[in-house]
């Protein structure tokens, strides 16, 4: 891949060390420094020449759909373009108020726009348009439906080494490309790594990036998130692209362990730890992972892996990445470890409902100071691919029958009328309900939030509910104490009721049912999902025909998506009659527990009773004794 020539694009800029967030002395006060009230930053003209076409964009070309996020400088919206050549395309629109930006932050914003306009890489977010009004700046970016890596990390606490290896490998290619353009990223952290709908990463938020350095030049400004700062950034000795590889190591450590390597009780202590503390290496990590971390956590930047003239090539040769095919990775031919469960084009499941529930409104910006107009001259930008594209006719994306999580101010009873109870479980109750607008009948599972977190069940149903033999999730509502899962109504009742009515099934009947169930379980296992509670009462018929093809596997309340390094699960969830012995022993279990349950299911259909019949008060030890006898 040809690389851009390094040129000095910022010859007039001197970003004198910016203030820290507190007034502590110590390591953060070393070197060149300005006081909190004396930020010295020179305003600079835009020097980039971006191909601009007749199709310049403005805010009237976009319809606001949702709020994705909000900060002190402005908001990020989900928007739909309504003018050609890309009508109906969804984007993320970053809106920054000029009047609330300090001069320093205005420079950063302009840098972000210039960097994004120049960078074209599969693992870096793409800028499509940039424009301004009297009071605001607008960046139109890729809308990445998978949310950020921080959200996924906070949910899973820590990742497997294989997961981490994949994310780090894609990240290394993205960082290496930025470095080849003379850009230091300087703010590498999980919040700035987004996931697209396939699960591939995209680097975003270039507000702290420093452009146009080469390996002989250094930046001196104090910036970034303190826990991810390299020692040379902390002590202001000057830093180059090697600072990003230290942050890369911090990110690796956090993903593998669920904690940060250097974190004190406050900012000052954290910085002291970064400069002086010995790294506590978790011994559960592989030798290769430990070796890579040690190579990245070199306090002398010249000795740090990736900091030499070879850059990321050094890192790519490390044994930790021995299984990565870098060419296939760059072409996005390797499957990500996690695919976000998004099917609607405007799905915001992975974004904070605190923001997505708000009414999207782009309020008028306060006019900025006169000097800001000069600073943002030339800010407008249209992606060349859009300029060159013919005004193609694009149809609106199809509206799919997939669930949305409604905000807490929309009540389930506002939309549905609740009817009789269908079934009662340990953590939930199932009722029939009727949609007030369409008069269509559905089932609703009402889950007590204080007893169980249904997020895994919702995610599995959202992702795999389109399978013909898995119950379809229609809607999700969240209220103060309950979650409402609206599904298709199973009018044919449970397989258990059918067995009880007939006493037992013929071999032909049992074979047909088991074939359909096995096909569905095989599909779930191929997707890394273990049901963990297969039994006749969780297998229902969608209608009265009794056709095995009308069977739906339901109740994914105990289900789990396999994520452990060895693929085994340790959480004991079961229905006693159908539970596998390895579940009772808590020895770790995988898809095999579902296969055991299928055997119990077949026995029950043929015999009319379970092979290891038990009373309601039986302990796991008593059930195991029967299984082993």
From Swiss-Prot:
<feature type="modified residue" description="Phosphoserine">
    <location>
        <position position="221"/>
    </location>
</feature>
<dbReference type="InterPro" id="IPR000719">
    <property type="entry name" value="Prot_kinase_dom"/>
</dbReference>
<comment type="similarity">
    <text>Belongs to the protein kinase superfamily. AGC Ser/Thr protein kinase family. S6 kinase subfamily.</text>
</comment>
<dbReference type="InterPro" id="IPR017441">
    <property type="entry name" value="Protein_kinase_ATP_BS"/>
</dbReference>
<keyword id="KW-0597">Phosphoprotein</keyword>
<dbReference type="Pfam" id="PF00069">
    <property type="entry name" value="Pkinase"/>
</dbReference>
<feature type="domain" description="Protein kinase 1">
    <location>
        <begin position="62"/>
        <end position="321"/>
    </location>
</feature>
<dbReference type="InterPro" id="IPR041906">
    <property type="entry name" value="RSK_N"/>
</dbReference>
<feature type="modified residue" description="Phosphothreonine">
    <location>
        <position position="359"/>
    </location>
</feature>
<feature type="active site" description="Proton acceptor">
    <location>
        <position position="533"/>
    </location>
</feature>
<dbReference type="GO" id="GO:0045893">
    <property type="term" value="P:positive regulation of DNA-templated transcription"/>
</dbReference>
<dbReference type="GO" id="GO:0005654">
    <property type="term" value="C:nucleoplasm"/>
</dbReference>
<dbReference type="GO" id="GO:0000287">
    <property type="term" value="F:magnesium ion binding"/>
</dbReference>
<dbReference type="InterPro" id="IPR016239">
    <property type="entry name" value="Ribosomal_S6_kinase_II"/>
</dbReference>
<dbReference type="InterPro" id="IPR008271">
    <property type="entry name" value="Ser/Thr_kinase_AS"/>
</dbReference>
<dbReference type="GO" id="GO:0038202">
    <property type="term" value="P:TORC1 signaling"/>
</dbReference>
<feature type="binding site">
    <location>
        <position position="94"/>
    </location>
    <ligand>
        <name>ATP</name>
    </ligand>
</feature>
<feature type="modified residue" description="Phosphoserine; by autocatalysis">
    <location>
        <position position="380"/>
    </location>
</feature>
<dbReference type="Pfam" id="PF00433">
    <property type="entry name" value="Pkinase_C"/>
</dbReference>
<dbReference type="InterPro" id="IPR000961">
    <property type="entry name" value="AGC-kinase_C"/>
</dbReference>
<keyword id="KW-0677">Repeat</keyword>
<keyword id="KW-0808">Transferase</keyword>
<feature type="binding site">
    <location>
        <position position="445"/>
    </location>
    <ligand>
        <name>ATP</name>
    </ligand>
</feature>
<comment type="function">
    <text>Serine/threonine kinase that may play a role in mediating the growth-factor and stress induced activation of transcription.</text>
</comment>
<dbReference type="GO" id="GO:0005737">
    <property type="term" value="C:cytoplasm"/>
</dbReference>
<dbReference type="GO" id="GO:0005524">
    <property type="term" value="F:ATP binding"/>
</dbReference>
<dbReference type="GO" id="GO:0106310">
    <property type="term" value="F:protein serine kinase activity"/>
</dbReference>
<feature type="domain" description="AGC-kinase C-terminal">
    <location>
        <begin position="322"/>
        <end position="391"/>
    </location>
</feature>
<feature type="domain" description="Protein kinase 2">
    <location>
        <begin position="416"/>
        <end position="629"/>
    </location>
</feature>
<keyword id="KW-0547">Nucleotide-binding</keyword>
<dbReference type="GO" id="GO:0004711">
    <property type="term" value="F:ribosomal protein S6 kinase activity"/>
</dbReference>
<feature type="modified residue" description="Phosphoserine">
    <location>
        <position position="363"/>
    </location>
</feature>
<feature type="active site" description="Proton acceptor">
    <location>
        <position position="187"/>
    </location>
</feature>
<feature type="modified residue" description="Phosphothreonine">
    <location>
        <position position="571"/>
    </location>
</feature>
<dbReference type="InterPro" id="IPR017892">
    <property type="entry name" value="Pkinase_C"/>
</dbReference>
<protein>
    <recommendedName>
        <fullName>Ribosomal protein S6 kinase 2 beta</fullName>
        <ecNumber>2.7.11.1</ecNumber>
    </recommendedName>
</protein>
<feature type="binding site">
    <location>
        <begin position="422"/>
        <end position="430"/>
    </location>
    <ligand>
        <name>ATP</name>
    </ligand>
</feature>
<feature type="binding site">
    <location>
        <begin position="68"/>
        <end position="76"/>
    </location>
    <ligand>
        <name>ATP</name>
    </ligand>
</feature>
<dbReference type="InterPro" id="IPR011009">
    <property type="entry name" value="Kinase-like_dom_sf"/>
</dbReference>
<keyword id="KW-0418">Kinase</keyword>
<keyword id="KW-0723">Serine/threonine-protein kinase</keyword>
<keyword id="KW-0067">ATP-binding</keyword>
């Amino acid at each position: 891949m040809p690389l851009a020539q390094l040129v000095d694009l910022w010859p007039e800029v001197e970003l004198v060390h910016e203030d820290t967030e507190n007034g502590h002395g110590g390591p953060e006060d070393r070197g060149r420094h300005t006081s909190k009230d004396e930020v010295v930053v020179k305003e600079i003209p835009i020097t980039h020449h971006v191909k601009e076409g007749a199709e310049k964009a403005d805010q009237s070309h976009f319809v606001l759909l949702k709020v994705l996020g909000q900060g002190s400088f402005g908001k990020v919206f989900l928007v739909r373009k309504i003018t050609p050549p890309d009508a109906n395309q969804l984007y993320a629109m970053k809106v920054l108020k000029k009047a609330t930006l300090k001069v320093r932050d205005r420079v950063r914003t302009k840098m972000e726009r210039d960097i994004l306009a120049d960078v074209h890489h599969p693992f870096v977010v793409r800028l499509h348009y940039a424009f301004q009004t009297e009071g605001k700046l607008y960046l139109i970016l890729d809308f990445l439906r998978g949310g950020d890596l921080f959200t996924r990390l906070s949910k899973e606490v820590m990742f497997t080494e294989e997961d981490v290896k994949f994310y780090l490998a894609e990240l290394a290619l993205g960082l290496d490309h930025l470095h080849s353009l003379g850009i230091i990223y300087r703010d590498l952290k999980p919040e700035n790594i987004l996931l697209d709908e396939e699960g591939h990463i995209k680097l975003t938020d270039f507000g702290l990036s420093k452009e146009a350095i080469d390996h002989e030049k250094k930046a001196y400004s104090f910036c970034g998130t303190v826990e991810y700062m390299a020692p040379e950034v902390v002590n202001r000795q000057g830093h180059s692209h090697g600072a990003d590889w230290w942050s890369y190591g911090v990110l690796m450590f956090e993903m593998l362990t669920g904690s940060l390597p250097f974190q004190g009780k406050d900012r000052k202590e954290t910085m002291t730890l970064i400069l002086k503390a010995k790294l506590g290496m978790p011994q559960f990590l592989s030798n290769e992972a430990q070796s890579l971390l040690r190579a990245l956590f070199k306090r002398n930047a010249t000795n740090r892996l990736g900091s030499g003239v070879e850059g990321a090539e050094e890192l790519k040769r490390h044994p930790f990445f021995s299984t990565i095919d870098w060419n296939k990775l760059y072409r996005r031919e390797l499957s990500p470890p996690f695919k976000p469960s998004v099917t609607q084009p405007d799905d915001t499941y992975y974004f904070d409902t605190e923001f997505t529930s708000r009414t999207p409104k782009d309020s008028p910006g306060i006019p900025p100071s006169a000097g800001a107009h000069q600073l943002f001259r030339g800010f407008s930008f249209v992606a060349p691919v859009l300029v060159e594209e013919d005004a193609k006719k694009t149809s609106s994306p199809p509206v799919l029958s997939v669930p949305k999580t409604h905000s807490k101010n929309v009540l389930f009873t506002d939309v549905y009328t609740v009817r009789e109870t269908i079934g009662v479980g340990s953590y939930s109750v199932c009722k029939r309900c009727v949609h007030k607008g369409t008069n269509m009948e559905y089932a609703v599972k009402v889950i007590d939030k204080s007893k169980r977190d249904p997020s895994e069940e919702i995610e599995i149903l959202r992702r795999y509910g389109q399978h013909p033999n898995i119950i379809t999730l229609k809607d999700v509502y969240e209220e103060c104490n309950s979650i409402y899962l609206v599904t298709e109504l199973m009018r044919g009742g449970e397989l258990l009721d059918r067995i009880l009515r007939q006493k037992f099934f013929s071999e032909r009947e049992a074979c047909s049912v088991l074939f359909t169930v096995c096909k569905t379980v095989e599909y779930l296992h191929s997707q890394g999902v273990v049901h963990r509670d297969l039994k006749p009462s969780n297998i229902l018929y969608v209608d009265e025909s009794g056709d095995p093809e009308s069977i739906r596997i339901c109740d994914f309340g105990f289900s789990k998506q396999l994520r452990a390094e060895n693929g085994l699960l340790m959480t004991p969830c079961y229905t006693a009659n159908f539970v596998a012995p390895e579940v009772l022993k808590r020895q770790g279990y995988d898809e095999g527990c579902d296969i055991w349950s299928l055997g119990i299911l077949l026995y029950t259909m043929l015999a009319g009773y379970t092979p290891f019949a038990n009373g309601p008060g039986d302990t796991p030890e008593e059930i195991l004794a029967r299984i082993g006898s």
